[in-house]
Amino acid sequence: MAFQGTSRTLTQQSSAASSGDLQKILFSPDAIKKMATECDLGRHHWMRADNAISVRPLVPQVTSNNLLSFFKSGYDAGELRSKGYMSVPQVLCAVTRTVSTDAEGSLKIYLADLGDKELSPIDGQCVTLHNHELPALISFQPTYDCPMELVGNRHRCFAVVVERHGYIGYGGTTASVCSNWQAQFSSKNNNYTHAAAGKTLVLPYNRLAEHSKPSAVARLLKSQLNNVSSSRYLLPNVALNQNAAGHESEILNESPPFAIGSPSASRNNSFRSQVVNGL
């Protein structure tokens, strides 16, 4: 089915065979593996002294080659309206420190276009995080779609750039950066409203809280009372109200920390602080 100029999805604009080819390019086992090994999608990237500047493209080189060929052949055949664009609505980075808070150092994180030799931050979206501020969540929103093209011998696409500064005397890993995004590819492009880079400082997970509260005592007391045969000693399925421990109600209903991005975490964001635990 040839392209007819309507605003339809890419798979509708191309033939069924071409759609299958595109799916294979993006979601084959090899393509998924390359996204992990070359781009660190969803993986922890360690910032070390011998890796002070990290440039991670959002699309692997092999995938870029295949996408470029796919769109070019469709464009030359008159089936697609362009040679292809890459669209990334948002890039989210979770950053945690791996040294003590008194270590003097910082991270500079930004989104760049590999078509720019200087690798300047896109629209000034750049965040600097000092070691004592971590953990934190960072978000970037590109204001345009990136053409799938070659610039010299470089494949043009967006990239996450992380620069490590300071940390004198710390040769090992001082911070971990875990980036997530969802790249989209289409034969049409757009421009988007400019938004400043987001920076959210996150409360560290208090793993000592469960050991500092007498919740175990309250649970034991409730269990013993509920096992008494007389109904007048049966407790309803509610938290105990103890004068000796006024915060037991909160303790008994306390849930373990949720992982970032889980459905349970999103439902509970309205009443509990979000934490970064083990990113």
Curated annotation (Swiss-Prot):
Domain of life of the native organism? Viruses
Return any one Pfam family short name: 3A
Alphabetically sorted, this entry's keywords are: Host cell junction, Transport, Viral movement protein
Q: Where does this protein reside within or beyond the cell? A: Host cell junction, Host plasmodesma
Write out the GO biological process terms: transport of virus in host, cell to cell
This molecule's function is given as:
Transports viral genome to neighboring plant cells directly through plasmosdesmata, without any budding. The movement protein allows efficient cell to cell propagation, by bypassing the host cell wall barrier. Acts by forming a tubular structure at the host plasmodesmata, enlarging it enough to allow free passage of virion capsids.
What is the recorded name of this protein? Movement protein
| Record organism | Cucumber mosaic virus (strain Kin)
